[in-house]
Amino acid sequence: MAAPALSGDQIRETFLKFFEGKGHRRLPSASLIPEDPTVLLTIAGMLPFKPIFLGQQVAEVPRATTSQKCIRTNDIENVGRTARHHTFFEMLGNFSFGDYFKKEAIAFAWELVTEVFQVPAERLAVSVFEEDDEAFAIWRDQIGVPEARIQRLGAKDNFWASGPTGPCGPCSEIYYDFHPELGNDGLDLEDDSRFIEVYNLVFMQYNRDAAGNLTALEKQNIDTGMGLERMAQVLQGVPNNYETDLIFPIIQAVAAIAQRDYASESESVKVSLKVIGDHLRAVTHLIADGVTASNLGRGYVLRRLIRRVVRHGRLIGIDRPFTAEIAETAIALMAAQYPNLREREAAIKAELTREEQRFLETLERGEKLLAELLAAATDQIRGEDAFVLYDTYGFPLELTQEIAEEKGLTVDLAGFEAAMAAQRQRSQAAHETIDLTVQGSLDRLAEQIHPTEFVGYGDAVATAKVTALLREGQSVEAAEAGDRVQIVLDHTPFYAESGGQVGDRGVLTGESLIVRIEDVQKESGFFVHYGQIERGLLQVGDSVTAQIDRACRRRAQANHTATHLLQAALKLIVDEGISQAGSLVAFDRLRFDFNCPRAVTPEELRQIEDQINQWIAEAHGTVVEVMPIATAKAKGAVAMFGEKYGAEVRVIDVPGVSMELCGGTHVANTAEIGLFKIISEAGVASGVRRIEAVAGPAVLEYLNVRDAVVRDLSDRFKAKPEELSDRVTALQEELKANQKQLTALKAELAIAKSDALVSQAIPVGDAQVLVETLTGVDAAALQTAAERLQQKLGDAGAVVLGSSPEEGKVTLVAAFGPAIIAKGLKAGQFIGGIAKICGGGGGGRPNLAQAGGRDASKLPEAIAAALDQLKTAIAS
């Protein structure tokens, strides 16, 4: 039986539901910005669970399943050139934390692939680690896979380790066979032309010590990964991942802008279209998760991807800004699974436009130098010059080659590579003398000074010693007024950002010294105070008075305790199974993300708000205790899944209301919160909702703003506040009636115009052809006019009408009679092709179709092309 043609969204949902049915908790995708400071981006589905696998924290559930968005750029040059390399991909995974192991994981995987996804068993082959006889036996004896379809591979391919020491274990992979007719002789699972790996099962069963010895782990874990794009390729029967419904709509949108037909293009054009389709998925998610383009870290990854998009756009003839436009397609394609894309759409488009424009200016400068080089060259551009273009101006080598070829010249690639190698050597030599970044400097300082002691739970002011001082990430001995610095103290009352709560603000003072502290972060065990010296000189070893801004701290405390009350109210009113997925506790607001498959209703939100304000009014005392984590769990304390906890934990208890593990600062009594108000509730990812709220003085500030808006509306509508709703409803009904009347008038006008146009039809053979532009007619009226004209012209009538009802927008309509359709002309296909001239597309039925475009300046060209094409097609 052939594999069912499931959509990418259906494959994802089927996978997650399957494992929910096997006792796994569905968890949302983590951000592309990982909590692990050693990793630049989230590169695998297991990364959010790495602390659990390494034994650094205890799992809150025994089984979990996720669809994790990931980014990898290590094979970026292969993107678009192979069937399966990507920068952005989704990794479907099922995980066991000390629960089931090899036998169950293999059985689950086989059941899912063969019974649920209905992939024929004869199309599958598996690999095991060469020494893993247990897995081999399970596949052969319990699953029934023939020995000839099981291949033993070495540690390079089939043994996972987190590092030279620590948890590790063998892997087993399921491969899809595109050519089973080739048989099993000489089976080579690494043959990419025949096999594709679709499912990887990692069995974490050993601990490796410094001597390389393996000992069995007490708790064995399972980590699996199924590439969504790869499984979509298999189930949808397409030749590569790019032609699945997960990516191809983006490629089609790019092709429309470039006026290209993907199916008939050369391989080089297809590569560029695939690169753009892939990278647009990556950059939209990176920006949505808070990354901005820069020359460092994640920002550089984003900048590089955007520039590759622009470069490949130019290679296929796109000579205008287009990334923000294509982002609309990417967002529309993925927003159902990742609602934050829609919420961040404006920011995504703005960042893309800004970075694209910056790169286009860079290219423009490079093109001027290239023009000079072309004029001076006889047969070849020197490699050193091409490298200057690349290194100094950011001008891609491929673009230099393309332009040179147009002039009949070549580029000295060997010279370019030599210049590149020399630059790498210079960079490596320079790196040895460069001062370290903040993180690197602190790692070095950790060998010399003790971690910061936090005294801020009880003290708002403390005398402390400056143990380290950094300026622009470099360790210095002193800094002066005007310098922006990072300061490490031996102990501090300043809370460092963690657990969703922002870092404290305040001042450091000394003799003739004032340092304004704007933020505090925790790095390598140190509390790093970020601020600016307003007066005086600060030196390592100085004694300073550290004082937090008490007003800011009180607001943060109120918001943090209110967040705990919010989670308790959600569990009480909506669903006991709700769990925290993230939070923000700022001075002016709070945000709480939680796992929930549906929206919280307005009535539930009202009940939640009322319940929290009731708890506030009841003036519950807050009890803070430090206890063993096992004791806390036994008492029913709520922990956030995925958060790191030590053996001893801090418990915040509002007796009878809430008990949570938390390291943040809180009010001593709920009455100190004052008031609580929900601002909004929305989805941020599949199965994840977000509530934003204010507490304490911020409620009054929020209500004052709302009150000012209501007063302004009352003045505008000359109505009392309580009458505004009725007044707006009346205006909406009036507007609706006016719009209906306007539409009718436009239709009458279009019909009147169309009646006058009948005489302008021209005979082509035995057909009557009418192609015209109507001014200011909307889509509905244009369609009515086209239908009426075609009916008047008869069965052999062909009508194409165009209009630009809004600035920059184009509407096109085609109406064909039966005799025209009999000649092989179909309105949908015809008008869709014409619309490409205006940068758009569309379609419809053979007899009537509508299309749109984005470039009104091309409307005359489109109308002329429509007439020419109709004449040619009908005459032939």
Swiss-Prot record:
GO terms classed as biological process: alanyl-tRNA aminoacylation
Single GO term (MF): ATP binding
Top-level EC class: ligase
Keyword tRNA-binding: yes
The record's free-text note on cofactor binding: Binds 1 zinc ion per subunit.
Residues binding Zn(2+): 560, 564, 662, 666
Annotated PROSITE patterns: AA_TRNA_LIGASE_II_ALA
Cofactor names: Zn(2+)
Pfam families registered for this protein in UniProt: DHHA1, tRNA-synt_2c, tRNA_SAD
Keywords tagged on the record: Aminoacyl-tRNA synthetase, ATP-binding, Cytoplasm, Ligase, Metal-binding, Nucleotide-binding, Protein biosynthesis, RNA-binding, tRNA-binding, Zinc
PANTHER family recorded: ALANINE--TRNA LIGASE, CYTOPLASMIC, ALANYL-TRNA SYNTHETASE
HAMAP family for the chain: Ala_tRNA_synth_B (MF_00036_B)
Name of the molecule in the record: Alanine--tRNA ligase
Species of origin: Synechococcus elongatus (strain ATCC 33912 / PCC 7942 / FACHB-805)
